[in-house]
């Protein structure tokens, strides 16, 4: 069944005209040599190959992809221009724009709601902190139909700061499910100077008008997303976006991108975010391109330390690896509800034994842990999820086991927040007990603990 999904049909006027011209010519030439059967066969093949696609490309497309890849595979991609801020009057003067190839772009960050749990039900991640790509398309149609948008998510399933044995243990506990320890999401608005010429000219001439139009559109889209329950903020810097989506690049091969010490491969997969974030990788980037009036397309970039192998259900974008970095994908997809923030740390399971995750990486908080077992579980799972753990001097040996630090203030440092392992002024409080978790957003959310036997040795080290 997966094999048949690689094939499709697409009719375009240009290919139809060529087929209508070549088929009679082939038949006429072959009739002249009394080879009518050959003419009919060639005509049938021309008709078939003018509409048949293999992984989104016709035969002519694959030939073009091969020559394009041979021309560019040893050259590095063009570097984006320096960002410019202050292209229009308030409220859009804090929106950065810059050139990326032939497009002027602006970025909107989607801010996750704090303490939004993720429950894994039969392999699917259930969370209410999502953005629907159909909503993004409707907003583009209503406010800026000549722009296109990329919904970009970047993150990782497990961290890299903990020892390899602890990371392997946490991966075993988490299983092959879509529960990334870290994930951030942006909407990248892209303006083509040719398509937006009329809209941009209403504001000013040249590049200035284009920048003003893009900034005003970004501000309007962010406001409308907020009205629909999605916390969206225009970015005045590309730093966070670049850091999260940066890929090491040395050269492009036919099926991957070779970096300094990593490999990145671009894929398509029809299963949506549940399938995309279940694939094992050191770093994951998903990009869904939305255009008004057209089917969306998606690309998944998986970065690994070893030579990549195609995950089950994925299709590698052969010859189009660099193009996929910019969201250029020949295969169409459908609209999805895309999770915005991290799934977070595994804190327990429901009464029906569905795993429950809670993010701690977007707001400062203090946590009250009921006993040594809860303390051990939360600390080692946070370390495996990529946090930097700081413990008191009395836990020096335990801190060494998880690559932690020793300091006066016990805490867990996330990329954008801190979780204090004790009372702390000025922040909210989370209470974790064997039968519930209490957060500033939830009042005693019922859970049950998950107690893998392999974690017991860490508790023994803590109690020594």
UniProtKB/Swiss-Prot annotation:
It holds the Pfam family EccE. Keywords: Cell inner membrane, Cell membrane, Membrane, Transmembrane, Transmembrane helix, Transport. This is ESX-1 secretion system protein EccE1. Belongs to the EccE family. It is a multi-pass membrane protein. The keyword NADP does not apply. Signal peptide: none annotated. It is found in: Cell inner membrane. The keyword Cell division does not apply. DNA conjugation in M.smegmatis is unidirectional with distinct donor and recipient strains; mc(2)155 is a donor strain while MKD8 is a recipient strain. Mutations in a donor strain that alter DNA transfer do not always alter DNA transfer in a recipient strain. Part of the ESX-1 / type VII specialized secretion system (T7SS), which exports several proteins including EsxA and EsxB. Plays a role in DNA conjugation, in at least a donor strain. Disruption phenotype: Increases efficiency of DNA conjugation when disrupted in donor strain. Loss of secretion of EsxA and EsxB, but not their expression.
